[in-house]
Amino acid sequence: MRALPIARSVSELRAVVDGWKAEGLRVGLVPTMGALHAGHLSLVRLALSKVDRVVASVFVNPTQFGPNEDFAAYPRDEAADAAKLGGAGAHLLYAPDVAGMYPPGFSTTITVSGVSSGLCGDLRPGHFQGVATVVAKLFLRVRPDVAVFGEKDYQQLLVLKRLVNDLDLAIEVIGAPIVRETDGLALSSRNAYLSAEQRALAPGLYRTLRRVGADILGGGRVDDCLAWGIDELKALGFGPVDYLDLRDGATLERLDDAPEGPGRLLCAAYLGKTRLIDNIGV
């Protein structure tokens, strides 16, 4: 297997990307925080189906973690990540350090209003500012034609689509379907935090989402279905349940009735100390 080239500085990154663009090649970007799994690699493969060259970034972004979150504990293994990305077909790994992304005196943040409110936006203050700012910097550095993000972080996906739209960036943002284990658990780097007992319980989140979604589409009152879902999650061992809500799939506005167009059922809940998120289309 070929060794995947790694760029650490902006100048190294741009030297490679400028060369590709001089040849008329289309470039894709897959931003990640590392600790890669099959879900991340599916993003690379989707990007490869759209462009000629793919840059994958690995950067554990401190500005999107809250003071009591898991920045220090977040798993890091660059060598393993590089091997996986190379095997998936990526052409370049961009791996800046914190000083390279946020040099001394850095004082700019980007706020995307509207879709960043509610859900994780309310429960993780500053999170989407950190996401929007770092992704905007990655966009400016890589200048991709296409960027691919997973639908598991659905609110994040809509925040970044709004960012690109509002700032007139010539980038196509593509959402990739959630990749799941055979028992339904959405793949996540944080699944590594689960004990064996918790891992056995974790698929209950997806099962509950599916049941709630089916009940809503079957004519159940939305509030009653959501309340049942929260109670069911608690009975399964989850808690606290940060939210279980039905939203418009394009705007994330709360829906009180079954959606007439694409809707999204979103949930965030703790299993022990691990916060799991998931969502399904309704």
From Swiss-Prot:
Binding residue positions for (R)-pantoate: 64, 156
**Catalytic site residues?**
40
Q: Which GO terms describe its molecular function?
A: ATP binding; pantoate-beta-alanine ligase activity
The residues the record assigns to binding ATP are 33-40, 150-153, 179, 187-190
Asked if the keyword Nucleotide-binding belongs to this entry, the reply reads yes
Catalysed reaction per UniProt?
(R)-pantoate + beta-alanine + ATP = (R)-pantothenate + AMP + diphosphate + H(+)
Q: Name one Pfam family in it.
A: Pantoate_ligase
Give the free-text miscellaneous remark of the entry. Answer: The reaction proceeds by a bi uni uni bi ping pong mechanism.
Q: What is this protein called?
A: Pantothenate synthetase
Q: What is the lineage of its organism?
A: Bacteria, Pseudomonadati, Pseudomonadota, Alphaproteobacteria, Rhodospirillales
